[in-house]
């Protein structure tokens, strides 16, 4: 994608959310160079930004979008952040990360940082936050109710729109799924 975007001077903004982990290995094991530096090898301007700072992200992305939209070509933005949870449901990050590391990064939670920023400037207050929590709860209840109202989809139907014309493999898979559903 880099080569194509650079060659075509495409108005693309690549955003890489670097959570510093490649499953259970730090990304520094895979590459000693920061990811954003790779883009410059393709002639693409690149920047690394604190991905946990909403204001910084907004400023960098606005600038990157303006650059790309003005016809100057692609831009690469690396949002430097941290994966707080496990990689998968079978992953145990305590095998390769310390509680101290997680605690340190937990203090940079972007939601908490933005809330603090807005409160310190008098833009929002606790009354506003309480109202937001009520709206969130109501929205969540609405979404859960809508999900429960929908019928369970027929699994074989999920393959109907994979291709304009189903391939023999897709048809065979759909038949197998339909047979499996009948046997349940």
Per-range role (PLM):
Residues 1-149:
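Glycine-rich ThDP/TPP pyrophosphate-binding loop and its adjacent helix/strand module
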């Amino acid at each position: 994608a880099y080569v194509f975007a650079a060659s075509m001077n495409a108005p693309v903004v690549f955003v890489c959310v670097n959570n510093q982990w490649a499953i259970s290995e730090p990304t520094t094991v895979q590459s000693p160079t920061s990811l954003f530096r790779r883009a410059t090898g393709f002639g693409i301007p690149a920047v690394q930004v604190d991905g946990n700072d909403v204001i910084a992200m907004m400023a960098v992305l606005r600038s990157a979008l303006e650059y790309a939209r003005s016809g100057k070509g692609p831009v690469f933005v690396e949002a430097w952040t941290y994966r707080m949870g496990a990689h998968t449901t079978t992953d145990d990050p305590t095998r390769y990360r310390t509680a101290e590391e997680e605690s340190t990064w937990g203090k940079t939670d972007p939601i908490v940082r933005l809330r603090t920023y807005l409160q310190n400037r008098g833009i929002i207050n606790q009354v506003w936050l309480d109202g937001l929590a009520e709206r969130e709860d109501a929205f969540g209840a609405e979404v859960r109710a809508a999900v429960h109202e929908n019928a369970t989809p027929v699994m074989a139907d999920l393959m109907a729109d994979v291709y304009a014309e189903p391939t023999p493999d897709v048809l065979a898979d759909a038949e197998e799924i339909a047979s499996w559903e009948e046997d349940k």
